[in-house]
Amino acid sequence: MNAPIILGIESSCDDTSAAVIRERKILSNIANTQTIHNEYGGVVPELASRAHQQNIIPVVQKSLAEAKIQQNEISAIGFTRGPGLLGSLLVGTSFAKSLAMSLDVPLIEVNHLQAHILAHFIYDANPTPPQFPFLCLTVSGGHTMIVLVRDYFDMEIIGKTIDDAAGEAFDKIGKIFGLDYPAGAIIDKLAQNGNPDAFTFGKPKLEGYDYSFSGIKTSVLYFVQKELQKNPNFIRENLSDLCASVQKTIVDTLMNKLQKAVKDLGIKEVAIAGGVSANSELRKVMQSNAEKQGWNIFIPKFEYTTDNAAMIAMVAQLKYERGEFTDLRTTATSRYDF
């Protein structure tokens, strides 16, 4: 019996992506990132859904072509049902349902956040994946959480942000600095030439493992406004130091809670996932903890950090193996709990 070939489709925000997987190995992973939102300083939902409609067919076609797969060879179709922007999700969901119906193959819904975590089980991403149980710090523009992963689909959120996500904080602070959207990668790059101890910003004090990032943003805003009154060129003259200091503050905040969870639970299998897991400072601090605290760490390949269909296909394969299929009458949902 031939190994199943799964097509994965991702459209939760502003990335239209399709991927093909077989035996946990990615045969193709194509993405079209929408740049139209840059001028607006954030994702515009209506524009995003329209762009998905234009992009989804060519992206899927390119994914199949790169994998050297014909449509009739597809065993099942996995798609992001949520969470995310409803209009964007509906495009991917409708396309996946239509294609599954026309090919008479199973449809498999995928939770976008679970997919970020389970991307660690893609073979080419990590030939030696995490052992259960493990902790995963999942950080993106829309979510920040610490997840206790007991099994593939046995996950518990033990800590999460009560306001802004870490990626959202990077973007909002980037706007204060006059940087383009999305600002996370720009701040990371500028921080390479800056002093992370140049400026000190307020850090939230919360019990347990929960996060808060809105206070950091406010602290930066008030500090910059005060300095600009003294020197109108303050941001331009200190941009690298500002970026390095902000990055250190956010990463320290992320790691403090993760370190607490590791200590309290006694679990030293530790992973990171999501778009912010591409941040160089976060990766460096994770590596430092591996060396000093004896953590066994798992850091995703860069192509699996941002929204991508490879992780959707990975989860779909796991569900296919378990015989967990989705009714064709299903629809997308902007909120989708584990």
Language-model features: locations:
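Short beta-strand scaffold segments in enzyme catalytic cores
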Residues: 16-21, 136, 144-148
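A contiguous, well-structured pocket-lining segment that forms one wall/lid of small-molecule binding clefts
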Residues: 189-270, 279-293, 320-323
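Glycine-rich phosphate-binding loop plus the immediately following alpha-helix
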Residues: 150-193, 217-226
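N-terminal beta-alpha supersecondary unit
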Residues: 4-83, 112, 116
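Short Gly/Thr/Asp-enriched flexible loops that form oxyanion-binding sites at enzyme active sites
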Residues: 79-103, 122-123, 280-289
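Glycine-rich phosphate-binding/hydrolytic loop that grips phosphoryl groups
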Residues: 116, 300-338
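Conserved phosphate-binding catalytic cores of ATP/NTP-utilizing and phosphoryl-transfer enzymes
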Residues: 1-2, 110-134, 315-316
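Conserved phosphate-binding/catalytic loops in two-lobed NTP-binding clefts
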Residues: 109-110, 270, 287-312
